[in-house]
Amino acid sequence: MTTFLAKGELNEMEEQGLIQSFEYTYELAWTTLKDFFEDQGESAIFGSRDAFRLAFKRGLIEEGEVWMDMIKSRALTSHTYNEQTAKAIAQSIRGTFFPEFVKLRARLETLTRQTG
């Protein structure tokens, strides 16, 4: 995702690549959280919404609404393609989603160092 974000304006193909990168990163984020919480004895995580809510409750993420917006955007990328929707999602990735992924990664790396 950083490769796309380092560029200025994206053409349509690059924008599609950015969105696909978001989809992959989103899936990786919630499944990593699921694994993290299962390692701590949590067993009631059945999807991304559960994982993000628990992460918010436990202080791993701070911007709960942004993560809920990610769920909506991820669903849109799976079920429809509309140029305006794609542009709006790409803007959200650049402006709010990517920084949240970076914060989550840093938080998990810190926790890993503290417990490892």
Regions found by a protein language model. Name each.
Residues 1-116:
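Solvent-exposed interaction patches of small proteins and small membrane subunits
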